[in-house]
C-alpha cells in the first residue's frame, strides 16, 4: 500500500489490534511517520502484527509519558489505526518502523495477551460534508497559508506539499495539515479527537494562521538583525580598508586605534549608563585633542581609572556556615563573639539570597578594638577567606588630609582617587572586605578632617552613591564589608563611632597564649624558617617560661618574635654543624639562646606603708600600677606627681577628703592632717596617666600612711571612689585581671557592679585561678588590704 493512496475500504479493517502507546508523538490518518520502539511490550506488539501478515497496529497517545507500563486509564481513548510499511532492527535492541495512519478509532476494550497489549477498536469514519462557501474558503485559505509558510522558510517535504494541494476532502486536508503543524502532542491529540471534519478544518486553520504569524515576525527579526549586521560589517570592511591603505602608506592612525580601544573597554566595563555617558563624553574630548597635550594625558588617566574599576564584578559569597566556621577556627583561637557575628551575617545573606524578594544586603561595618598583637588585622584576613572575598587593607595611621580618603579633584597636578577607590581597584571586585587599620590614629589639620570623609564611606544609607572627588561619578560601596581596627575608642569622633558595630578584643591569658603558641605561632615560624616539628619541639614548660620571662604584653606579637628568634638560632646551628637532629626546647635552652629573663613574675613579698598595687588599662592592655603615698611635715597640702591627668587628680582629692571625714573611725588624730603635707606619686613619671579607676587604691594608700598600717603586696585593686566611700564600676577589667595574673597577684579587689561583666568575660580557668573580691564600699577594701599597725621597731633600734 502506497503512502498516500486513496482511502482503504474501512469495512475490511479488523476489530482488534496490537497496541503501541506513543509518547510525545501523534500519527494522523494518511500521515507517514517513523517510530522508534524500545519497550518490550511494544516490540512484541509489532512482531505480532507482522507475524499475522495484517501489519496493522493501533497507536494511541500516553497521558503520562514518564509511565513505563501504562494501564487503560493512562492511554487516550481516541487513537489511529496504522499500517507498518517497513521495519528495521537497531543495535541497541530497539526497532524502527515506518507507519502510515489509516483511520481514527476508539478503544472499546484493552487486555494483555502474550506480553503485549491488544485493543478492541471501533473504527471512526469521517461523515460526508456539504461543500459550503465556508468549507471552500477554509480549504483555499489553508493552501494559501501553506505557500506563505514555505516562503517564510518552513521546511516541508515537496511531495507532501503537492498531495496537500491536491486534496479536497475537508477531514483529510485538516489531518494532513495538522501533521505539519509545530504544536505539542496534547494539542495534536485535541485535533485528533475532533470528529467533525469542518470543525477540525477550522481549528487547524486557526493554528496554522497563528504559526504563519510567528514565522512572519521571526522573518522580520531576522531581516532587522541581518541589516544591523550588514551595516556593522560594511563599517568594519571600510575601516579595515582604510587601515590597510594607511599601513600601505606607512600612516598607521595610532590615535584612532586608541579611541577604539577605549570605546571597547567602556562597553565591556559594565558601568551604569549615566557613568558610561560621562566616559564617552571625556572620550570625545580626547578625540579632539592633540595626543601629546597635557590635558590629553589627564583624560587618559581618568578613563583608565573608570574602565578598570569593577562596576559589575563581584565574588560569589561562600554561604556554607560550617566551612566558614572551620576557616575562622583554623586561623584564630577563641574570639567566639566575632566569629558568631560573621556567621550571623552569612546566615542573613543566605536567607536573602534564597528569598524571591530583595536579594541585596548591606555589608556590616565592624570595629575591632583591642591592644596590639591580639589578631585584629589577621582576623580581617580570615573573615575575607571565610566569605570567599578579596581582602584589602588600608592603613589610616597618621592620615591627615581628607583628600586621601575622598580623592583629589582632577584640576590638581598629579591628582589621584582616594584610598577607598584605590582599594576597590586593587580588589577587582565590588564586594571585597576592606580593613581600615588604626582608625583611632587619624590626624586632623588645616587640610580637612579625614574622619568626616569616612562618615559617608561607613554609612550604609549613603555609601551606595559614594562620589570620589577624582572620579566625579558615584560608585556603589554598599556591598563592601568594612572592618575598622583601633586600640582605643576615646580618640574616635562620636558620629563615626555611631556608624560602627564595636567588638572588643581583650588581651590573652597565659593559658590562651600557650594554646596559640602551640597551634599557630610555632608551626608558622617553623615553616617560615625552613624547619618542621620533627626537628624542633617546644615543651609546655618552655613556652610558659618564655611567656613569663620574656614577654609582658596583652597580645602575642612579641611572643611570636621570641619564638622566631629561637628557631632561627637553631637553623643557624644546623647549618654550622651540618647535622640535622631533633632539638627539644627547654627553659635552660631558652636562657642559652635569649639570655637571662627580662621580666620577673615574682611579686614583692614585703608589705609597705603607703605602697598600693593598682590596676590600669592602656591601649596596649592591662598594667600593674604602683601608687606611692607618703606624709611629711607641712601644713596639710596635697602634692601630686607622676604626669597625672585632671580626672586622676580629682580622684586623689576625693580620696584625701574621704579619709579626713572618716578620721575618727580609722583611728586617726584629725590634727595630723594640718601638721603634714601629703605626697602622692604614680611611677613612671614620664608616662601620662588619667582616669578614675585608681580611686580606691589612692584612698587605701592615704589611709595606710595616716594609720601606719602596711598594705598587702599580694592584693591589687581597681575602682572609682565617691565622697561617701562608694566603689563605682570601671572599664577594662578583663585586661586588668590578666595583668595582675601575669604579675603573680591572685587576689584582686573589684567593684561589685562589675561582677556580672567579669564573670561573663573571663574564661573559667582564669576565674578559678584568681581570688576575685567584689566590694561596694571602701571600708571593705580597708579590711582586706590593710594589715595591723606597723610597730616603730626601726626608731627604737636607732635610739639605742
Swiss-Prot record:
Coiled coil: none annotated. Residues 606-788 form the Lon proteolytic domain. It comes from Sulfurihydrogenibium sp. (strain YO3AOP1). Induction: By heat shock. One of its GO terms (biological process) is protein quality control for misfolded or incompletely synthesized proteins. One of its GO terms (molecular function) is ATP hydrolysis activity. Its main location: cytoplasm. It is an enzyme of class 3 (hydrolase). Pfam families: AAA (PF00004), Lon_C (PF05362), Lon_lid (PF22667), LON_substr_bdg (PF02190). ATP-dependent serine protease that mediates the selective degradation of mutant and abnormal proteins as well as certain short-lived regulatory proteins. Required for cellular homeostasis and for survival from DNA damage and developmental changes induced by stress. Degrades polypeptides processively to yield small peptide fragments that are 5 to 10 amino acids long. Binds to DNA in a double-stranded, site-specific manner. It comes from the Bacteria. HAMAP family: lon_bact. Homohexamer. Organized in a ring with a central cavity. Keywords: ATP-binding, Cytoplasm, Hydrolase, Nucleotide-binding, Protease, Serine protease, Stress response. This is Lon protease. It is found in: Cytoplasm.
Amino acid at each position: 500500500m502506497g503512502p498516500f493512496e486513496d482511502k482503504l475500504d474501512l469495512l475490511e479493517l479488523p476489530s482488534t489490534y496490537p497496541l503501541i502507546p506513543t509518547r510525545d508523538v501523534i500519527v494522523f490518518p494518511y500521515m507517514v511517520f517513523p517510530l522508534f520502539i524500545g519497550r518490550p511490550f511494544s516490540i512484541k506488539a509489532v512482531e505480532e502484527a507482522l507475524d499475522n501478515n495484517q501489519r496493522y497496529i493501533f497507536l494511541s497517545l500516553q497521558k503520562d509519558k514518564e509511565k513505563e507500563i501504562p494501564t487503560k486509564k493512562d492511554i487516550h481513548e481516541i487513537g489511529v489505526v496504522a499500517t507498518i510499511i517497513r521495519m528495521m532492527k537497531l543495535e541497541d535492541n530497539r526497532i524502527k518502523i515506518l507507519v502510515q495512519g489509516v483511520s481514527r478509532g476508539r478503544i472499546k476494550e484493552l487486555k494483555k495477551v502474550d506480553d503485549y497489549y491488544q485493543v478492541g477498536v471501533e473504527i471512526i469514519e469521517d461523515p460526508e460534508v456539504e461543500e459550503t462557501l465556508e468549507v471552500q474558503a477554509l480549504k483555499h485559505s489553508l493552501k494559501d497559508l501553506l505557500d506563505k509558510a514555505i516562503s517564510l522558510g518552513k521546511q516541508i517535504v515537496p511531495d507532501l506539499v503537492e498531495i496537500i494541494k491536491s486534496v479536497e476532502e475537508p477531514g483529510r486536508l485538516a489531518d494532513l495539515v495538522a501533521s505539519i503543524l509545530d504544536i505539542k502532542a496534547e494539542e495534536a491529540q485535541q485535533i485528533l479527537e475532533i470528529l467533525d471534519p469542518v470543525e477540525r478544518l477550522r481549528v487547524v486553520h486557526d493554528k496554522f494562521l497563528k504559526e504563519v504569524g510567528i514565522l512572519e515576525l521571526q522573518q522580520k527579526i531576522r531581516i532587522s538583525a541581518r541589516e544591523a549586521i550588514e551595516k556593522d560589517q560594511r563599517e568594519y570592511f571600510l575601516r579595515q580598508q582604510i587601515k590597510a591603505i594607511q599601513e600601505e602608506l606607512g600612516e598607521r592612525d595610532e590615535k584612532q586605534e586608541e579611541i577604539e580601544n577605549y570605546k571597547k573597554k567602556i562597553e565591556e566595563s559594565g558601568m551604569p549608563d549615566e557613568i558610561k555617558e560621562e566616559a564617552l563624553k571625556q572620550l570625545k574630548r580626547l578625540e579632539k585633542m592633540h595626543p601629546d597635550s597635557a590635558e590629553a594625558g589627564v583624560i587618559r588617566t581618568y578613563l583608565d581609572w573608570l574602565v578598570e574599576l569593577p562596576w559589575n564584578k563581584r565574588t560569589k559569597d561562600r554561604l556554607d556556615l560550617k566551612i566558614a566556621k572551620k576557616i575562622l577556627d583554623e586561623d584564630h583561637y577563641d574570639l567566639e563573639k566575632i566569629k558568631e557575628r560573621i556567621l550571623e551575617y552569612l546566615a542573613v545573606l543566605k536567607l536573602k539570597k534564597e528569598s524571591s524578594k530583595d536579594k541585596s544586603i548591606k555589608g556590616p561595618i565592624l570595629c575591632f578594638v583591642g591592644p596590639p598583637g591580639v589578631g585584629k588585622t589577621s582576623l580581617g584576613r580570615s573573615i575575607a577567606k571565610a566569605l570567599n572575598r578579596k581582602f584589602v587593607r588600608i592603613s589610616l595611621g597618621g592620615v591627615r588630609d581628607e583628600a586621601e580618603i575622598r580623592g583629589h579633584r582632577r584640576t590638581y597636578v598629579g591628582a589621584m582617587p582616594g584610598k577607598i577607590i584605590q582599594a576597590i581597584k586593587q580588589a577587582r571586585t565590588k564586594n571585597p572586605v576592606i580593613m581600615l587599620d588604626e582608625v583611632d590614629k587619624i590626624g586632623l589639620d588645616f587640610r580637612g578632617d579625614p574622619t568626616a570623609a569616612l562618615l559617608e564611606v561607613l554609612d550604609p544609607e549613603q555609601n551606595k552613591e559614594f562620589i570620589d572627588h577624582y572620579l566625579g561619578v558615584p560608585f556603589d560601596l554598599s556591598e563592601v564589608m568594612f572592618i575598622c581596627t583601633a586600640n582605643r575608642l576615646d580618640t574616635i569622633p562620636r558620629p563615626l563611632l555611631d556608624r560602627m558595630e564595636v567588638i572588643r578584643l581583650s588581651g590573652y591569658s597565659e593559658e590562651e597564649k600557650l594554646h596559640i603558641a602551640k597551634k599557630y605561632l610555632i608551626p608558622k615560624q617553623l615553616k617560615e624558617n625552613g624547619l618542621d616539628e620533627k626537628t624542633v619541639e617546644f615543651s609546655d614548660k618552655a613556652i610558659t617560661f618564655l611567656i613569663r620571662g620574656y614577654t609582658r604584653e596583652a597580645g602575642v606579637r612579641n611572643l611570636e618574635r621570641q619564638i622566631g628568634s629561637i628557631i632561627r638560632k637553631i637553623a643557624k646551628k644546623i647549618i654550622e654543624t651540618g647535622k640535622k637532629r631533633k632539638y627539644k626546647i627547654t627553659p635552660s635552652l631558652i636562657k642559652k639562646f635569649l639570655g637571662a629573663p627580662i621580666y620577673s613574675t615574682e611579686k614583692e613579698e614585703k608589705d609597705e606603708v603607703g605602697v598600693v598595687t593598682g590596676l590600669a588599662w592602656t591601649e596596649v592592655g592591662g598594667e600593674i600600677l604602683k601608687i606611692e603615698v607618703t606624709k611629711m611635715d607641712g601644713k596639710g597640702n596635697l602634692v601630686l606627681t607622676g604626669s597625672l591627668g585632671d580626672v586622676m587628680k580629682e580622684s586623689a582629692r576625693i580620696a584625701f577628703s574621704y579619709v579626713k571625714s572618716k578620721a575618727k573611725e580609722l583611728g586617726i588624730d584629725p590634727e595630723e592632717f594640718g601638721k603634714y603635707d601629703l605626697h602622692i606619686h604614680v611611677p613612671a613619671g614620664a608616662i601620662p596617666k588619667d582616669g578614675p579607676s585608681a580611686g580606691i587604691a589612692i584612698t587605701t594608700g592615704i589611709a595606710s600612711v595616716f594609720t601606719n598600717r602596711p598594705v598587702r603586696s599580694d592584693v591589687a585593686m581597681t575602682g572609682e571612689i565617691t565622697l561617701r566611700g562608694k566603689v563605682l564600676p570601671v572599664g577594662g577589667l578583663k585586661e586588668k585581671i590578666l595583668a595582675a595574673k601575669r604579675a603573680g597577684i591572685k587576689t584582686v579587689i573589684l567593684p561589685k557592679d562589675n561582677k556580672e561583666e567579669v564573670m561573663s568575660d573571663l574564661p573559667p580557668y582564669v576565674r578559678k585561678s584568681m581570688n576575685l573580691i567584689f566590694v561596694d564600699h571602701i571600708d571593705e577594701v580597708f579590711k582586706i588590704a590593710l594589715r595591723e599597725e606597723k610597730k616603730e621597731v626601726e626608731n627604737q633600734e636607732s635610739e639605742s
